[in-house]
UniProtKB/Swiss-Prot annotation:
Gene: Ier2
Protein name: Immediate early response gene 2 protein
Biased composition (Low complexity): 125-136
Organism the protein comes from: Rattus norvegicus (Rat)
Region annotation (Disordered) ranges: 54-156
GO biological process, any: neuron differentiation
Residue list for modification N-acetylmethionine: 1
Family listed: Belongs to the IER family.
Cellular component GO terms, alphabetical: cytoplasm; nucleoplasm; nucleus
Broad class of where this protein is predominantly found: cytoplasm
UniProt lineage: Eukaryota, Metazoa, Chordata, Craniata, Vertebrata
Induction: Induced by basic fibroblast growth factor (bFGF).
Bias-annotated ranges (Basic and acidic residues): 64-77
Amino acid sequence: MEVQKEAQRIMTLSVWKMYHSRMQRGGLRLHRSLQLSLVMRSARELYLSAKVETHQPEFPPSRRALDPRLHPPREPEAAMEAATPDVEQPPEPMDTQEEVLRVQETPALCDPPPARVSRKRRSSSDLSDGSDAGLVPSKKARLEEVEGEATSEVSNRLQLPPAQTEGAFPNLARVLQRRFSSLLNCGPAVPPPTPPTCEAKPACRPADNMLNVLVRTVVAF
């Protein structure tokens, strides 16, 4: 019966392919090769299945049921299943679980929250006011004294002594300043009326003497 059904299936499939491949170029030749391969494959499958059925030994159902290889013993599994319920501990009641949770939460609620440190930047004026307010009056007075001494030292250093401003020879500088100021301030000397018979003398003789004195002092120093 199975061989007849397979033959009918192959015939219907081949007729259907021949009808659809009639317009193609080389369709019949291709269909013949495909049909031959299909027939050979189906024949091989039928042959192998029939051979396996003939060589397979027939066992009675009683022996198959008693075969230990097909049905291994289930004693270890039963022992394990019986031991597992004893090992498992019964779950705790809900009342005890709620009490444990309350005990764990109470210390966390009792602890005061940590003080948050403000990270805002303070201005220099706020910092200076806070530092001055926190200082003791005695310390504040000492700081003011130290600041006054520092400012006085700086002012003394900035103001040079008169000896340094005048130079290495203060007396010489003063003498030269006075001499030059007197020369600049003095005007042209008016010659006194002399008789016509006397020879005229130079009017700026004292100035020449003064210049000679100044030149000598400069050369000496």
